[in-house]
UniProtKB/Swiss-Prot annotation:
Protein name: Uncharacterized gene E9 protein
Biological source species: Equine herpesvirus 2 (strain 86/87)
Gene Ontology CC annotations of this record: host cell membrane; membrane
Bias (Low complexity) ranges: 40-133
Residues that span the membrane, as ranges: 147-167
Keyword set, alphabetical order: Host membrane, Membrane, Signal, Transmembrane, Transmembrane helix
UniProt region (Disordered), positions on chain: 40-135
Entry keyword Signal: yes
Signal peptide extent: 1-19
Compartment annotation: Host membrane
Membrane topology: Single-pass membrane protein
Length: 205
């Protein structure tokens, strides 16, 4: 009995080492998972019931991991069910890698199609809005030029009025200053020459 217990413990330790080695190799490489899983099954067939209990725990872990990966594939990848069936036959790591690569390709295609649609929809809008903007710009330029012209005309009229008023005041001051200095109204030179000529003619007679 003691020898059987020792042998069972020894075989259990060997089974645990084999399962740990298979799990470590599945994490590192994807191609050797199928062969290592067969070795685990062979060890389980030769081991005692205690080792069978340990081997039943390892498939549950692998099944749980595979189910979790299949859930993630179903939630993320909506491309085709055939990819899900093929990934269930392969190892879980390879299925996750293939599902992520498929998702990346599908997302990139959707983004490119959306960008092309947006660019094609924006081009006719800009072509339609161009004449309106040009007309608005032309109207604004015409209004600005008319406003500048009106201001120039008003300034010119004000300048002419000020110049006329200044000339009239200057003439008025000249006439008023000459009359005040002589003590009487200014007499034109033509009248003075006529009077002198008449005086000379009367004196000669």
């Amino acid at each position: 009995m003691k020898t059987l217990c020792v042998l069972s413990i020894f075989l259990a330790l060997l089974g645990g080492l084999c399962t740990s080695s298979t799990t470590s190799t599945t994490a590192t490489s994807n191609g050797t998972t199928s062969t290592l899983n067969t070795t685990v099954s062979s060890v389980a067939s030769t081991s005692t019931p205690s080792t069978e209990s340990t081997t039943t725990t390892t498939p549950t872990t692998t099944n749980s991991s595979a189910s979790s990966t299949s859930v993630t594939v179903a939630s993320t990848a909506t491309t085709s069910p055939q990819t899900n069936s093929t990934t269930s036959l392969t190892s879980p790591l390879s299925s996750t890698f293939s599902s992520t690569s498929a998702n990346v390709s599908s997302s990139t295609t959707t983004t490119t199609s959306s960008t092309t649609k947006s660019t094609s929809s924006t081009k006719p809008k800009t072509s339609k809005n161009n004449p309106k903007t040009q007309e608005a710009g032309a109207e604004a330029a015409v209004m600005i030029s008319l406003g500048i012209l009106y201001l120039f005309i008003l300034l010119l009229i004000i300048f002419v009025i000020i110049l006329i008023c200044f000339i009239r005041r200057r003439q008025h001051h000249q006439h008023g200053g000459g009359g005040g200095g002589q003590g009487g109204p200014m007499i034109p030179l033509d009248v003075i020459s006529l009077e002198s000529g008449l005086g000379e003619s009367w004196s000669s007679e």
